[in-house]
C-alpha cells in the first residue's frame, strides 16, 4: 500500500461497468500540474525542417530531454514513480489511489505511459503538412479477456473547446474491435470531447473508443496517459459496504406500475447510450451484466432478466 485511499462505491463501479470510464474534473492540485508541465518540458514550435518527419523528430527530442521517467513494462505502480515527483504525488492522492485500487487492485502494474501532444496550428503550417485529428481507435489489439486494464488520461492544464481535447464514446468498451477497424468513424452519436479545467483525470477501461482532436490554438495541448494492468482478480476490490440484498433481486420488467429508481444497480447497467440501436443495443446490456458478474464474482447476478433468459437451458432429469 502506498498511501491511504478513498475507494469507489458500488454505484460508481456500476457506472464504470456501463460507461467504461469515470471522470474527475480538476481533482489534481495546481502545484502538481505545474510541476508535471515543468518536468515534461516544452516542444520547439519554431520554423525549421518541413514535412511529417519533423513531428516525429520533435517528439523524440522532447522525450529525450524530458524529466519524466522511463518505466519498464510490468513495473509495480508502487515503485514506478518516486514520491517526490509530480507523477508520484499524483498516483498517491487518496482519491486517485482509491479509484486505481478499486479497479485494478493494490499492486497494479504499469503497462506503459506516454506524453500525448496536440500541436498548434502554427507548427503544421511551418512544417508544410495538413493538420488532422487522430483516427478513432481502440487501444492495443483485439483483446477478448474478461480481465481489463485501465488508462489514466491526465490533463495538466485547462483544455478549451478549440484545443482538440480527446474525444471518446462512452459505453464502447465492451464492443471489441481490431484497434483501427473503426478509424473511418469520426463522429458517433453520444461521443464527448474533453473540455476541462487543469488537473482533470479520466480513468478509462482499455476498450473505450477514442481519438485526439485538432488543436486550433497557438499553444500545445498536453495529455499524459498511464496504462495499468491488474495483478489479481478484479473481484469486489471497491468499497462494497453499500451493496444490499435489493441490489441482487429481480424487479418487474416492461409492465411496471411504478417508475424504477435510476440509481439502482440494474438501472445503471441498463442505461442506454445515444449510439445504441433499439435491437443491437440490448447486446450491450448483456455485455454489461456479464462484466458486472465478473466484478462481483457472482455468475448468478442479472439485471432485468437479460442474461437469465438467454442462458435458460432446461435439462431433463433421470
What are these regions (language model features)?
Residues 1-19, 25-137, 142-143:
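Non-heme Fe(II)-dependent double-stranded beta-helix
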Residues 119-121, 169-175, 227-232:
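Short edge-strand/loop segments of extracellular domains
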Residues 127-194, 235-241:
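Catalytic core of non-heme Fe(II) oxygenases with the double-stranded beta-helix
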Residues 208-209, 213-318:
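Non-heme Fe(II)/2-oxoglutarate
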Residues 187, 192-198, 254, 258-259, ...:
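A conserved mid-domain beta-alpha-beta active-site/ligand-binding segment of alpha/beta enzyme cores
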Residues 113-115, 152-154, 224-228:
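A structural signal for short, well-ordered beta-strand segments
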Residues 196-210:
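Conserved metal-binding segment of the jelly-roll/cupin
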